[in-house]
Amino acid sequence: MQFKNLIIALHGVGASCSALRPPIERRATTEIPSDSFNSLETYWNYLYPWGATHNGGARMDEEHVSVTDGVLTLTAEPRDDQEDPIHYLSGAIHAKSTFTVSAGGGYDISAEFIAPVARGTWPAFWLNAASGWPPEIDIAEWKGSGKISFNTFNTSDEVAALDRDYPNPGEWHSVRAELRDENGHDVRVKFFLDGVEQTTQYGRDYIGAGLRLIVNYQTEGSSGSPGPTTPTTFQVRNVEVTSLN
């Protein structure tokens, strides 16, 4: 009887500790501040996490990354001195930190963009697996169609994907993704464009999986070819990552 009472008491202590955990909104901790581009190399590395190329016609190059007044500019420059399929030098950066949604937690990730949408332009703001693949969450992707895409991959064949019209691409637009623990295993992702919710998608078994945040300007590939014959730019500002774990 005493042993049974002890088990009940310990269970009650565990429940009390769980109940005392702060609400998720009170756990907010800024991991990448909105002015991080002013201290670029404190928070970001150049290129993709794995190197200079990825599924397109551009090779990433540090010289094609610049920051002015807190605005990141990635410039895709046509080149005829590269071996196929590379037809451009362009820019990419990725966060030095790895982000992992914990049980009961989440992340808010947001930024503002002036993104090209012409054929052959393929800028993206996305999360990719730190090890293996998936996870992958395309928080914002533009694939030369005049639309913006929101995507979550569970396998290469099982993909939640939504394309939306992207009006006035020469103006600034805001994008936000809210990642939350759904059930202890899966992550729920809500996507917002200019403050308006667009869709909700789910990443299976994403809890506990490390994610790398990437900002890049790829060309051709999935965005069509040939791409632009003169330099084009992808501009980004106010990237912010808030942990709710």
Residue spans of the language-model regions?
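Low-complexity, Ser/Thr/Pro/Gly-rich disordered linker/stalk regions
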Residues: C17-Y107, F113-R119, A130-P134, I139-G144, ...
